[in-house]
Amino acid sequence: MLANSSSTNSSVLPCPDYRPTHRLHLVVYSLVLAAGLPLNALALWVFLRALRVHSVVSVYMCNLAASDLLFTLSLPVRLSYYALHHWPFPDLLCQTTGAIFQMNMYGSCIFLMLINVDRYAAIVHPLRLRHLRRPRVARLLCLGVWALILVFAVPAARVHRPSRCRYRDLEVRLCFESFSDELWKGRLLPLVLLAEALGFLLPLAAVVYSSGRVFWTLARPDATQSQRRRKTVRLLLANLVIFLLCFVPYNSTLAVYGLLRSKLVAASVPARDRVRGVLMVMVLLAGANCVLDPLVYYFSAEGFRNTLRGLGTPHRARTSATNGTRAALAQSERSAVTTDATRPDAASQGLLRPSDSHSLSSFTQCPQDSAL
C-alpha cells in the first residue's frame, strides 16, 4: 500500500494485502466504465430527448438508466483507489461512492421489478389494474423509489468511512473494505439484512412471480400470439437473467459473509477469508448490471431501437419522418378515445411503440414529465 504522507501509529494494524483483488477490480471496472458510461448516457438521451412518446415501461427504463449512469460516473474514483491501493481522497468521497453502489444495486432491483409488475398488470389483469398503469402513477412510484434508496444511502454512507492501517512506516486509509468485527456485530449486519430484504428479496420474489404468471398466461391455447407479446417474453426473460447473474450471487454471498463476520455462524478465519474472496468477485457481477441494462432497452423496446437506427439517417429524412409520425400520433389519439373500451388486450402492448393508438391515449408523457 502506498501513501502520500501520514504519521506512523503503532496502535494501527498492518494493512492486509488486497493488491490482487485491487488489480482484478481495476481491470473489470475499467471495462464497465468504458462500456457503461456511453451506453447509459445514450440511453438516457434517447428516453429524455429523442422519444416523444413515453409508455409506462419507458418511465421505469429511464430511471433505471439514470441509476446506472450515476454508478458509472462514480467509477473513476474507485479506479484511482484500486490503482493506488490506498484512499487519497476526502473521507466524504469514500462514503458517497460506497453509498452510490448500494443505491444503484437496490434501485436497479426495484426498477426491474416495476417493469415486470407493469407487464404482469398489462397481460394478466389488463382491466382490473388498468388504473395503476398510468404515467403519473409510474412517476410517483419512481419518485418513491428514489426517496427510499436515498434514505438507505445515509446509513450506508456512515458505515463506509475509510479504515486506517499501517503500511511500512506510514498510516494509510482503505475504502470499501476492512470493516471491523465490531462494526459487523453492531449496526452493519442489521443494515445489510434490511437492505437485502427490501431491495433484493422482495423485488426478486415479485419478478419471479410476475414472470411466471405472464408466461403461464401467454402459454394458454386461447392466448393471442403477437410480435408484441414475444417482445414482452424477451423483456421478462432478460430481467430474470440480470437478477440471476448480477444480483443473486452477490446478495447471497454478502448475507453469508455478514453472518460469518458478525460471529452468528462459527467459521475459521481461512474459511471466512475464502468467502470474502468469492464476495469480491460477486461484487463485480453486481456492478456489471449497468452494462447489461442498455441491452435490454435495445432488444425489448422497439421505439428505443428505432430511434438509435434513425440516428444514422440524414437529418432531413429524420425530420420528415418525425413530422409524419407526430401527425399520425395526433390522429391516433383522437381515434383511440372511441376504441379504447373495446380493446382490453391492448393494455399489454406498452413497450415504447409510438404507432400503438391505445398506448398513446393511456401512456403518453412528455420528456419533461420524467420521474427523475
UniProtKB/Swiss-Prot annotation:
Its main location: membrane. Residues 48-55, 118-136, 209-239, 298-372 are cytoplasmic. The chain crosses the membrane at residues 27-47, 56-76, 97-117, 137-157, 188-208, 240-260, 277-297. Not expressed in frontal cortex, basal forebrain, caudate putamen, thalamus, or hippocampus. One of its GO terms (biological process) is behavioral response to pain. Residues 312-372 are annotated as: Disordered. Keywords: Cell membrane, Disulfide bond, G-protein coupled receptor, Glycoprotein, Membrane, Receptor, Transducer, Transmembrane, Transmembrane helix. Belongs to the G-protein coupled receptor 1 family. This is Lysophosphatidic acid receptor 5. It comes from Homo sapiens. The gene is LPAR5.
